Design a protein with these regions (language model features):
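Mid-domain beta-loop-alpha active-site segment that forms a flexible
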Residues: 58-66, 95-133, 149-153, 254-255
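Active-site loop of classical SDR/Rossmann-like NAD(P)-dependent oxidoreductases
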Residues: 223-236
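Contiguous beta-strand/loop segments that form the cofactor/metal-binding neighborhood of enzyme cores
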Residues: 122-204, 234-244
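A contiguous active-site-proximal alpha/beta segment in oxidoreductase catalytic domains
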Residues: 35-96
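A short helix->loop->beta-strand "cap" motif at the edges of active sites that frequently abuts
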Residues: 24-26, 50-54, 165
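Short polybasic amphipathic segments
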Residues: 187, 204-219
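C-terminal helix-rich "cap/oligomerization" subdomain common to oxidoreductases
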Residues: 4-7, 54, 162, 237-273
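Beta-loop-alpha module in the N-terminal Rossmann-like domain of NAD(P)-dependent dehydrogenases
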Residues: 1-47
Length: 273
């Protein structure tokens, strides 16, 4: 018997599919972004309440990146005190001809802040412990892709969590051809007693190994490469959550709140070019 349905369809169609799945008595696990409008979010929440099923989201830049998993362990273990600010950078390589057409149609992919920005806001909430946030500023632009007028090739946003933590992130489609991987993803986590830097996919001009973790605290300066050493505990936890009806992998509230804030950031964004 099928108990969990996984999907990565067109972004704007993910909510409708999820509602059908939940009404059929199954849990749903979907690629980010899990929806593109607040109306879809309202329908998702209503269906969750009616069915008791799960609508889980694959925020892969934390859940499937070992350095990000390790950073979570450092934060939870008190290595840098309380997380008070997160700054993220999520550059990507576009290579538009290799991508499906819907990925550059705004109504379908939701815009850059809704799409790849979802990774960043989810990590902000996770590392700071905030359960909600206010978008204080957001911007989008299309700098060099006039042939794709609905594409945002740049976006950034600032936010303040309901616990006082602050966040900033930048996402873009400007990875240069000379980089050895699809994007030089970075994350900076400031705590009250130290800070962490993640060089997720490459350590530029030093090593092509992914999952580089740097941190500084009262005990000194630290570095570890965790590629192949940490694993991805989320997936096993999710399976157990579906079986036992628990919320150890990720709470439903967190999964939806991260995406809600991304949609709001996109809606509020000032177009700079």
């Amino acid at each position: 018997e099928v108990k969990l349905v996984a999907a990565a369809c067109i972004t704007s169609e993910r909510a409708d599919l999820g509602v059908r799945v939940m009404k059929a008595g199954k849990d749903y696990f979907v690629a980010k972004a899990p929806f593109t409008t607040l109306e879809q979010l309202a329908l998702i929440k209503q269906t969750i309440q009616e069915t008791g099923r799960k609508y889980m989201v694959h925020y892969s830049e934390r859940l499937q990146v070992e350095s990000a998993v390790y950073a979570g362990e450092l934060v939870k273990g008190g290595a840098i005190g309380k997380g008070i600010q997160v700054m993220g950078m999520g550059p990507h390589r576009l290579d538009a001809p290799s991508r499906p057409a819907w990925l550059i149609e705004k109504e379908k992919y939701g815009g850059i802040l809704c799409d790849i920005g979802s990774h960043q806001i989810e990590q902000f909430l996770y590392y700071t412990g905030a359960t909600d946030a206010t978008i204080t500023e957001s911007k989008i632009g299309n700098y060099v892709h006039p042939e794709y007028p609905e594409l945002d090739d740049f976006g950034d946003a600032s936010l303040i969590g309901n616990n006082g933590a602050t966040g900033y992130f930048r996402v873009d489609w400007f990875t240069p051809d000379g980089l050895s991987t699809w994007g030089d993803g970075r994350m900076f986590i400031l705590g009250t007693d130290g800070y962490i830097e993640l060089r997720k996919y490459v350590d530029v001009a030093k090593s092509d190994m992914s999952d580089n973790v740097y941190w500084v605290n009262k005990d000194g300066e630290h570095y570890i490469n965790v590629q192949g050493k940490v694993g991805f505990p989320f997936f096993g936890q999710l399976i157990l959550d579906c079986i036992n009806r628990t919320e150890n992998a990720m709470t439903q509230e967190h999964a939806l709140k991260a995406a809600e804030l991304c949609v709001k950031a996109q809606m509020l964004a000032r177009k700079v070019v």
